[in-house]
Amino acid sequence: MTFKKRILYAVIILLLLYVANIFISTGYFRTITNNFEGSILQKIKLPGAEDITISQIDSFAIVSSTKRNKFPNKTQETGGLYFIDLKNKAYQPIHLTKNFKKPFAPHGISIFKTGSVYTIAAINHTEKGEFIEFFQLINKKLKHIKTLKNELIFSPNDIVLLDENSFYFTNDHKYKQGIQRLAED
């Protein structure tokens, strides 16, 4: 066997080992077993529920929900934020953003309480870009405070409020479309 063939075979073997390592390390061949031993209190029908955050102090949950279409979106998706009173065993969701006039497809959400007022931050995916919407929750009603747009917010996924004016957020992709986005997924 010639020297060039040996080098070629070595490169192919290394490449195959690298690809195998990617599949193994990312859990591609792993089997997940459902071991849930709890009970479901009630199924709540919300299309495309994405995130939930709970106020343990005041016993309620806020759920972000958007009927998800295929990616990339061909039309603006419509979603909402929902309030669920955890003290009321009916667990009826109240649509908090039904009167919000902007396109709204929420993703990650976070809440922060100051006094008796909750600030809610929601990632918003629209056809015109990615935004973070800020609301105040007072007596089960939302008031829109502001919209934040920034070049660093290009593929936001989740957010956590540190206070009513400070937060962390994550971008879950570097690329919006094309082969690079496919490779990231």
What are these regions (language model features)?
Residues 78-87, 131-138, 185:
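Beta-propeller blade signature
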